Amino acid sequence: MAGVPDNVKGVVELDPWLAPYGDILSARRFLADKWRHDIEHAVPGGRRSLVEFARDAYKSYGLHADAQSKSITYREWAPNATRAFLVGDFNGWDETSHELQNKDEFGVFTGVFGPGADGDFMIPHDSRVKVVFELADGSRIHRLPAWIKRATQPSKETAKEWGPSYEARFWNPASPYKFKHERPRLDPNVESLRIYEAHVGISTPEPRVGSYSEFTKDVLPRIRDLGYNAIQLMAIMEHAYYASFGYQVTNFFAVSSRYGTPEELKELIDTAHGMGIQVLLDVVHSHASKNVSDGLNMFDGTDYQYFHSISSGRGEHPLWDSRLFNYGSFEVQRFLLANLAFYIDVYQFDGFRFDGVTSMLYHHHGVGERGAFSGDYNEYLSDHSGVDHEALAYLMLANDLIHDMLPANGVTVAEDVSGYPTLCLPRSVGGCGFDYRLAMALPDMWIKLLKESKDEDWSMGHIVYTLVNRRYKEKVVAYAESHDQALVGDKTLAFWMMDAAMYTDMTVLKELTPVVDRGIALHKLIRLITHSLGGESYLNFEGNEFGHPEWLDFPNANNGDSYQYARRQFNLVDDGLLRYKHLYAFDKAMQEAEGKHKWLNTPQAYVSLKHETDKVISFERNGLVFIFNFHPTQSFTDYRIGVDEAGAYRIILNSDREEFGGHRRIEEENSVFHTTDLEWNGRRNFIQVYLPSRTALVLARNP
């Protein structure tokens, strides 16, 4: 460890190959530590914590009502403006009557407005507001307050007169929702996350936008029944364009009004907590919508207030048609860190899945030739790696904040395809602080196999290598498919395997066809081996647990604004005559087995067998034996499987059970597999099992 800076010795001890890059790692950590020091000492003559900094920001910026005095304070940062005025329904949209009188040296305007003539708040609850800025040349621009907590689509009449831009509303309910349940306390040393990825708007079988209340009533019970202990909510931050899937955020502190009110979202999260389910927010800090009239773009009349300037070449994403934040700006740090604290405190979110981390980490955004990462450390840690040091420092601060606010159970997940080293190691040892990264190579592997290879040509070694290929001590969220694979232009695993047969042959009243038989069998095997071998956490996109047919396509001009494919057909599971119920039952059994035997939050599995001819894979993890026969036709009698611990083993999960859509080829009752004291495949003992084609077994040793 000679020559390695003290502040990154921890990560180098975990990965000695990082030693030559110690100085670079140290400098990157130093920038984040310096920013934190500057933030905590920004108050003259005093000190405040990072948490206090973030909380003070969301509690002071924007519109805030004082219940005792009935006054409203409005604070906004707009350094390019010379004057600022609050307008809205409350003053007949008079652009001169309510000026924010004070502008400080940093460009922050503040106005305090007393009660109205009736003694109540000057601005009625849920009424429309805007801010008007006067610029140096005397021109005026109209904007939605940057910290607004509710924004809604205009009525048809308003849209005809003023355009389709969203409208800001002053949210100040007389009886705000009161949380009833504490956050679930999942011991991270024991429990692992089984995440159900969901989008409230599509969570209805009907071709329309679903609501928070419907999700609470109809979907949460399904998630609990399946055995997932966390939900990842997508498209919550307000976005004017529904078809953006929530990734073109316009109003960062407003939750999507399409689904209902802020209080109804609070009830959803509180209800989930009462079920013992954590709730994660899919947070979008990687970019922002280009919208001007209802977004952050050109907010104070400049293109460089929250974002890098267009002229710098860093202000726009090359593919996403969106604006890119200037993470080196103190005020941008305030805005984004406060955004995280706001969702933790006000809505009781338990953590975040950070969207677009690869785009944030590199000046090239993972696009083009430089986005084809080979794993060479020079791609990440050389002077020419293209890493955006300011974005990396912001992500470190964000992780500091979240884990300071939620020290026991806060969860952070990075959507990173690049494999950046130390991303998911603790800040205390020199890492970036994320708890998990998404294992984004796994769904790509499964789709590629299904598209390009015959079943008999699948390489067991390639499957295993891809599933276990992750950085030491850096945890990943494994998944076979997510929302990305469901989007139009791609297909879900079930649709790749069964295609048109899902429309005609899923009824139990018809004889099982070879296409559906294969699809159901492989769907179970793919998901179980991904779950058990691919990571330390698991994610499923809603509907995929039962093999949801078709693709996901939001209403847009190309499909005639249709909602036909922007929904989840949960009714298919409830129909006892359809085979979707079998896949649902298997997914439930898989989650229950993990919940009881807890293989996810344990060291990586020991893989003892990858047989290319037999198409059999076997491994042990946390005392369990997992056996997969991917062969399309060949079943094996008395197949030898190496196990380390001697004893008697029993089946705890069998994909061939009838209730899972299998053929019941294994007699489970009173089945016990006794070990033979002879070495096999590098293990001290072996058992012999009957292994039908396209079947998976999980065995546990009897106590």
Curated annotation (Swiss-Prot):
Q: What Pfam family is a match, any one?
A: Alpha-amylase_C
Binding of (1,4-alpha-D-glucosyl)n occurs at W93, K130
A Gene Ontology annotation in the biological process aspect, one of them, is: glycogen biosynthetic process
What is this protein for, i.e. what is its function?
Answer: Glycogen-branching enzyme participates in the glycogen biosynthetic process along with glycogenin and glycogen synthase. Generates alpha-1,6-glucosidic branches from alpha-1,4-linked glucose chains, to increase solubility of the glycogen polymer.
Q: Does the keyword Transferase apply?
A: yes
This protein is called 1,4-alpha-glucan-branching enzyme
Q: Which Gene3D superfamilies match?
A: Glycosidases, Golgi alpha-mannosidase II, Immunoglobulins
Broadest EC class assigned to this enzyme: transferase
Q: Which organism is it from?
A: Eremothecium gossypii (strain ATCC 10895 / CBS 109.51 / FGSC 9923 / NRRL Y-1056)
* The reaction(s) this protein catalyses: Transfers a segment of a (1->4)-alpha-D-glucan chain to a primary hydroxy group in a similar glucan chain
Q: Site described as Transition state stabilizer, positions?
A: D484
